[in-house]
Amino acid sequence: RWAALGGSILGGGGGGSAKTGAEFGDLAVRFSQLELTPLDQIDPETVVVTASMVGAPAAQEKFVSPADMMRCVELFTQSTGIRPGGIVTNENGGGSTFNGWLEASMLGIPLIDAPCNGRAHPTGVMGSLNLHRDPNYITTMTCVGGRKELGRHVECTVTGSIDHCSKLVRAAAVEAGGLVAVIRNPVKASFLQKNSAVGGLSLAIETGRRYSQGLEKSVENGVQEVCEFLGGEILAHGPVEEYQLRSEGGF
């Protein structure tokens, strides 16, 4: 619950459904005694992959199952010959804080406290650990998702530049009904030290704890607790009178 709350706050409202994310997180900790592993406890030579969800969380026909998540890892290993030694989430967000939890739990590998991004983001390049700046880096991305009964189930493996592979994965999400699970961008753990949001998951959990603690008194107190913890301030408050939610082009 704390991870879902804190992820939603740090994600800036992005990163998918906190309810769905918490369900996957609960499944992960039920399967094994999953623990969050600090980056400095990981061998620098360990190959780490990123787990993410790509697409439009508000799409009506979206569907990704736990089996789809595990199939992504299977396809990745089949294509690259690499068995990941650790996994990180691509970002903090309502649902995305939990990316990689189930895979780590079922594979028995570390869930590393070093998300690619401390907040939610819309494009694959934004969560690429600066790898898109290296013209020599060739990535492999695998993605799976979509309902079989609707004829939308897809499985893809793409290799190439991060920019072009990200666009292909986004296109796959559209064909799958709006969302796919993804495994991508293998790097050594040493690379994460300067290129990831080290400690981002534990920060989300503590943010959620402080917010939850404040909510026991009032919503206002919950917000104030978060402001004090993160060093923020309240700029405005009031009711939301109107908003627009649009799913288009896999976003």
Where are these regions (language model features)?
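Non-transmembrane, aqueous-exposed alpha-helical and coiled segments at domain scale
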Residues: 1-7, 19-250
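Extended, polar beta-sheet/loop recognition surfaces of beta-rich domains
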Residues: 13
